[in-house]
Amino acid sequence: MDGLTAAESRELDQRLQKRQVKEFMSVFGNLVDNCFTACVDDFTSKALSGRESGCISRCVLKSMSTQTRLGERFGELNAAMTAEMQRR
Amino acid sequence: MFGLGRPQPTSAEKIAAVENELKVVAEMHSRMVKICTLKCIDKTYREGDLSKGESVCLDRCASKFFETHQKISDQLQKETQARGGGGFGM
């Protein structure tokens, strides 16, 4: 990839793995923030209500489907954009 | 080293260049997810599955996000060139 030596490639892989951990934590953090904001609005009890809990489960499922679907589209569009840039 | 050719980038520079390129793509991806979720996903979460309408909206949102990216990038390039490379105070 981009004319890196094996050692450079290994170094890059290590850095990318660290990034991936960070990225996962940020996706997880955003998920908590979004689903909490969308679903939790009743502070008359300290435990999540059945309604809130159900909402959170559905929010997580839907967000995962959203991530997957947008991930596919992003891959396609990014590949097309890269190809177009190289053609110019 | 011996005055031959242009200076070779160091290992650190080469790695940083690839890393940076990937970072730009990853950032664009996470911005798109955030924005298209806001634009398309019903916030009541009565359903755990994406509806047909939401799915179509996400696809179109992704497409338009890229088109907007390209359009603004082209326009900025044109403006910058028109101002003799010194556009937008950069």
From Swiss-Prot, chain A:
This is Mitochondrial import inner membrane translocase subunit tim9. It comes from the Eukaryota. The keyword Membrane applies. Mitochondrial intermembrane chaperone that participates in the import and insertion of multi-pass transmembrane proteins into the mitochondrial inner membrane. Also required for the transfer of beta-barrel precursors from the TOM complex to the sorting and assembly machinery (SAM complex) of the outer membrane. Acts as a chaperone-like protein that protects the hydrophobic precursors from aggregation and guide them through the mitochondrial intermembrane space. A motif (Twin CX3C motif) lies at residues 35-59. It is a peripheral membrane protein. One of its GO terms (cellular component) is mitochondrial inner membrane. The gene is tim9. The lineage of its organism: Eukaryota, Fungi, Dikarya, Ascomycota, Pezizomycotina. The twin CX3C motif contains 4 conserved Cys residues that form 2 disulfide bonds in the mitochondrial intermembrane space. However, during the transit of tim9 from cytoplasm into mitochondrion, the Cys residues probably coordinate zinc, thereby preventing folding and allowing its transfer across mitochondrial outer membrane. It holds the Pfam family zf-Tim10_DDP. Belongs to the small Tim family. Disulfide bonds join 35-59, 39-55. One of its GO terms (biological process) is protein transport. Its main location: mitochondrion. Heterohexamer; composed of 3 copies of tim9 and 3 copies of tim10, named soluble 70 kDa complex. Associates with the tim22 complex, whose core is composed of tim22 and tim54. Interacts with the transmembrane regions of multi-pass transmembrane proteins in transit. It is found in: Mitochondrion inner membrane. GO terms for molecular function: metal ion binding. Keywords: Chaperone, Disulfide bond, Membrane, Metal-binding, Mitochondrion, Mitochondrion inner membrane, Protein transport, Translocation, Transport, Zinc.
